[in-house]
Amino acid sequence: MNWMELSIVVNHEVEYDVTEILESYGSNGVVIEDSNILEEQPVDKFGEIYDLNPEDYPEKGVRLKAYFNEFTYNENLKSNINYEILSLQQIDKTIYDYQEKLIAEVDWENEWKNYFHPFRASKQFTIVPSWESYVKENDNELCIELDPGMAFGTGDHPTTSMCLKAIETFVKPTDSVIDVGTGSGILSIASHLLGVQRIKALDIDEMAVNVAKENFKKNHCDDAIEAVPGNLLKNENEKFNIVIANILAHIIEEMIEDTYNTLIEDGYFITSGIIEEKYQDIESQMKRIGFKIISVEHDNGWVCIVGQKVSG
């Protein structure tokens, strides 16, 4: 299968709005190339300074690269995306640029390897690409071996990083966990590394489920995690201590009540994928359903909310 890569340059003020527009139309992830990074002295997570190629970044603003299945991307979709972006109140049309490039799936997989290197995603978790070797810094470090393939969730995005930190804080070995929209499976693997014995990973995309299963094998936990296709929690009859969902805000809104019903008493809902402009609506709806808000974390325009199921 081939993929259509959209390369869209916009001003910083609309970066998060455009990201949400692209994802709402079905983009399988968004890569961000920010011109501001060229003004910094790049240092990786291990303190090593490296050089950036200015040709990889726009002269102004930010370049968003989005990827669509070649069978779903068409002129109508292109027109709708263009219309919504150009309708944004803060859009700077003087730097706006929209380019298309058809990429073969094998090229896509190699593209990820150029950007993906070992890094510490949280206090305990280090993400290690499956094609690279890595030596742990200490015995407390938990390494997640990952090959994102055609699914997303590498740990470097603020939403995934915040979820990993929340998992460190709220998930106990005695808990049961259901990971909704598992993607690469990273959050399920993290839960397993903390000692959780019962984990279920759901994703509506069967390709993502297959990628997650491969990553579970790489981390020697494929027998410990049930990975299945699923549409949110609509047909879920089991109860869990923890529900994790790192997905888009409008999808989170759809599943809040089902999440409450899926949790046992005092269970936690860890959710991210929420932009700043939407988090208060999500928080209000969670409270209305019956959640007590335990934690709200902000990172670079994104928000992670942790709610606890309480009665009365």
From Swiss-Prot:
A cellular-component GO term for this protein: cytoplasm
Key word Metal-binding present: no
Entry-linked InterPro entries: Ribosomal_L11_MeTrfase_PrmA, Ribosomal_PrmA_MeTrfase, SAM-dependent_MTases_sf
GO molecular function, one term: protein-lysine N-methyltransferase activity
CDD domains, alphabetized: AdoMet_MTases
UniProt entry tagged with the keyword DNA damage: no
Residues binding S-adenosyl-L-methionine, per UniProt: T160, G181, D203, N246
Enzyme class: transferase
Top-level taxon of origin: Bacteria
Catalysed transformations (reactions): L-lysyl-[protein] + 3 S-adenosyl-L-methionine = N(6),N(6),N(6)-trimethyl-L-lysyl-[protein] + 3 S-adenosyl-L-homocysteine + 3 H(+)
Keywords: Cytoplasm, Methyltransferase, S-adenosyl-L-methionine, Transferase
GO biological process, one term: methylation
EC number(s) recorded for this UniProt protein: 2.1.1.-
Cell compartments where the protein resides: Cytoplasm
One Pfam family in the UniProt entry: PrmA
Protein role: Methylates ribosomal protein L11.
Similarity annotation: Belongs to the methyltransferase superfamily. PrmA family.
Protein name (Swiss-Prot/TrEMBL): Ribosomal protein L11 methyltransferase
Source species: Staphylococcus epidermidis (strain ATCC 35984 / DSM 28319 / BCRC 17069 / CCUG 31568 / BM 3577 / RP62A)
